[in-house]
A protein has these predicted regions:
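Flexible "stalk/tail and boundary" regions
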Residues: 1-30, 34, 43-100, 104-105, ...
């Protein structure tokens, strides 16, 4: 159900589970180089397409990777919202977001502000989450999974 239908942004965390057609799953460990680049899993790149977006994740210290379609659907879903609802979400999600296009080696660059928000060190885990992916610092992800 789109967030505009139930108004529960914390639950949806800015994602679009209604978009369908995408299946991402698995955990993939990678490293980030000194320029903020990482090899993005080929299996997930196939699902995301050639152009996608990376944003902060509401409620978690990780990053969300959106398809171009889901990113545009999120933008559209916010247009009719009152400013008191829309502006804080837009500032949080769009203000620090970056576009990603894998290079010939399959690497993507993650903006410094996004790396800082998620506490990304040189070791990260990319997690397939059905219709989107998340990028976590490896130690933070291990601590999170051990706590549940």
């Amino acid at each position: 159900m789109p967030p505009e239908e139930d108004g529960n942004w914390q639950f949806h965390r800015g994602l679009q589970p209604w978009k369908g057609g995408i299946e991402m799953y698995g955990e993939f460990e990678h490293t980030i180089d000194s320029k903020g680049r990482m090899n993005f899993p080929a299996k997930l790149r196939e699902e995301l397409g050639e152009h996608f977006y990376i944003s902060k994740t509401i409620g978690e210290n990780c990053l969300t990777v959106h398809t171009e379609h889901s990113w545009n659907a999120l933008r559209e879903s916010l247009k009719g919202k009152p400013q008191t609802v829309r502006l804080p979400i837009e500032r949080f999600l769009f203000g620090g977001a970056c576009e990603a296009e894998p290079d010939k080696q399959g690497r993507i660059a993650i903006a410094p502000a996004l790396r800082a928000y998620a506490g990304l060190t040189s070791e990260v885990v990319v997690v397939g989450m059905d219709d989107h992916a998340e990028i976590w610092d490896k130690a933070a992800y291990r601590a999170y999974t051990e706590s549940i």
